[in-house]
Amino acid sequence: MCSLGVVIPPYGKRRNLRAFFILKGDDEMIRVAILVDGGYYIKRANRLFGQKTAAERATELEEYCKKHLLQDKTGTYLYRIFYYDCPPCDKNIYHPFLQRNINLKKSDLYTWMNTFLNELKSKRKFALRMGRLSSNDTGYIIKPEKMKALCANKISFSDITEDNFRLDIK
């Protein structure tokens, strides 16, 4: 017999992990499955721990997940780490400010993300669950704070720069 419990960690020590599952079997060994929201983790890790190479970030994630098991020390066993994310976008997208197409496949972020995902695939206990990006809802938009200032006539369109745009992918 196996029981299943879902634990959503508080915003304390485990704030980078959204949830993890605890599977308890008859042998009293607690098997833990950790679920990682990939986009959220990368964003938070870059902010908290700084920029790193793809291999360093993958190793960091593995150690970070295992550290949660060591803190508990109640006979836990790592069943699997489920990493949820989408593959990087490889489209040509029109940039309205530059007035030209940007090939995202040639970007450093595309290369880094593919390397990172390949690193995770090669690690033990990791299972990647890849989603799909919408094919129609992709483009550059003006950042909300600049759009608000533009609509309130606090700035004019001539004050808008390339840095005021961000890629919006859904």
Regions found by a protein language model. Give the residues of each.
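Domain-level signal for Mg2+-assisted phosphodiester chemistry and nucleotide/NA-binding surfaces
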Residues: 21-152, 159-169
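Short, Lys/Arg-enriched N-terminal segments with co-localized hydrophobic residues
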Residues: 6-28
